[in-house]
């Protein structure tokens, strides 16, 4: 429980961006060997956000979902899917909007974002290995007029329609 809370604090304060790194740092800081599950960390993160942000979280969630809808409408030809904390309804002050899209050509998505006035701040290819299989996707980050951040991930169209398990819940 202490490790989950410490990892959640690291995520909430943006000292870490990913659950895996937050859990490793928490274990190191507390000198404990057992890693909590992502669910345990997520529950603690939700408690912290509720304690610190209260009702303003609901307003934040509504605003971010409206922004996500605008982005998704701009990218409708690329089968956008809202994922992450905005989709789950567990946003906090440092949350970003995460959207998956599907295309063979990431430039098409970058061009569409720019056409709709979104200013991309960074883009990169990312690779991960899950269950022995390497997977690559293209990630674009941008800041919205509200100050919120968004990330659009371009995935291979072959992945469209595949069911994926949430790594947190």
Question: Can you annotate each of these PLM segments?
Answer:
Residues 1-16, 20-93, 103-169:
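Catalytic core of pol beta-like nucleotidyltransferases
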């Amino acid at each position: 429980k202490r490790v989950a809370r410490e990892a959640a604090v690291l995520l909430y304060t943006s000292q870490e961006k990913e659950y895996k790194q937050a859990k490793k740092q928490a274990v190191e800081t507390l000198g404990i060997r057992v890693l909590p599950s992502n669910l345990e960390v997520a529950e603690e993160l939700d408690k912290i956000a509720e304690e610190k942000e209260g009702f303003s979280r609901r307003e934040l969630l509504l605003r971010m979902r409206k922004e996500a809808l605008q982005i998704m409408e701009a990218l409708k030809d690329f089968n956008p899917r809202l994922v992450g904390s905005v989709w789950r309804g567990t946003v906090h002050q440092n949350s970003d909007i995460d959207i998956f899209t599907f295309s063979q050509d990431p430039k098409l998505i970058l061009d569409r974002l720019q056409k709709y006035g979104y200013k991309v701040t960074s883009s990169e290819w990312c690779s991960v290995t899950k269950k022995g299989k390497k997977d690559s996707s293209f990630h674009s980050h941008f800041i919205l007029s509200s100050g919120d951040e968004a990330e659009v991930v371009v995935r291979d169209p072959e992945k469209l329609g595949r069911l994926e398990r949430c790594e947190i819940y």
